[in-house]
């Protein structure tokens, strides 16, 4: 399995900027039914991330997202192998990686995306190709 991050990442991502309000991010998550919102600068470079867990605490709705976002973000190039992403998530105990190309945000990869890959791989392994009569005859000779 030589799957790249690019093959699994979500590219249709919703982002926001640091000066937007926490309420804005809450509304995005609720409307889009997502659990994280990357925060980007004007050059579309990731500068933070807000997750649903960050929003559990009580904040005034007008508080800028820059005050609660995780600034210690983890990024991975889109052409990296998926096993590197999985190892990063496990070692850092995180559930989201921001995917970049030349420092620009191009996608997001979640632990759920990795689980889907494992599930699909297991399905393929449980359903190997069956032998046909021609294949069986060739094997005997």
Go through each PLM region and give its residues:
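Bateman (tandem CBS) regulatory domains
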Residues: 2-13, 62-73
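Histidine- and aromatic-rich ligand-binding microenvironments
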Residues: 7, 21-24, 38, 51-55, ...
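The conserved cystathionine-beta-synthase
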Residues: 15-33, 40, 76-93, 99-101, ...
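Short hydrophobic beta-strand motif reused across regulatory alpha/beta modules
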Residues: 48-53, 95, 100, 107-115
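Short, charge-rich, low-complexity interaction segments located
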Residues: 57-63, 123
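Cytosolic regulatory modules rich in charged/polar residues
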Residues: 78, 104-141
